[in-house]
């Protein structure tokens, strides 16, 4: 059974910004298990220190990141490392933190070449289609 990761990484250097799994990625996992067509193990990752060991343990075919202004660099740093090690892994970013204008969207992908797909807004239905 393939593994997918959905990450909403939280900075932990000073203190944990939230002790709970973010609601949005929990909803995506729940929706996928109810409506998805494939048997998949979906892992929710919150803490950056958990992502690397879990990645090497499970070798997921998809790694998705919630992309907010406070964790863009954190998520992209991991996305870049994952692509260097495993170019076949699909990297998905998602949230409303994405330009609306086509020209700026193209520029965003040029500045973030490790991202294969961006889901704008609610992610439940689009992630199911990935």
Over which residues does each language-model region extend?
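Glycine-rich beta-alpha loop elements in corrinoid/cobalamin-binding modules
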Residues: 31, 39-130
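Glycine- and acidic-residue-enriched helix-capping/strand-helix junction motifs
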Residues: 13-25
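Extreme N-terminal starter segment of soluble prokaryotic enzymes
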Residues: 1-5
């Amino acid at each position: 059974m393939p593994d997918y990761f959905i990450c909403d990484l939280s900075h932990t250097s000073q203190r944990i910004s939230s002790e709970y799994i973010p609601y949005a990625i929990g909803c995506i996992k729940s929706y996928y298990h109810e409506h998805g067509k494939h048997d998949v193990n979906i892992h929710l990752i919150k803490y950056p220190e958990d992502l690397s060991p879990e990645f090497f343990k499970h070798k997921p075919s998809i790694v998705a990141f919630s992309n907010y202004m406070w964790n863009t660099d954190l998520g992209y740093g991991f996305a870049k490392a994952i692509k260097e090690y495993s170019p076949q892994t699909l990297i998905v970013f998602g949230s409303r933190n994405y330009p609306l204008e086509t020209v700026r969207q193209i520029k965003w992908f040029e500045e973030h070449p490790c991202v294969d797909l961006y889901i704008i807004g609610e992610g439940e239905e689009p992630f199911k289609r990935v």
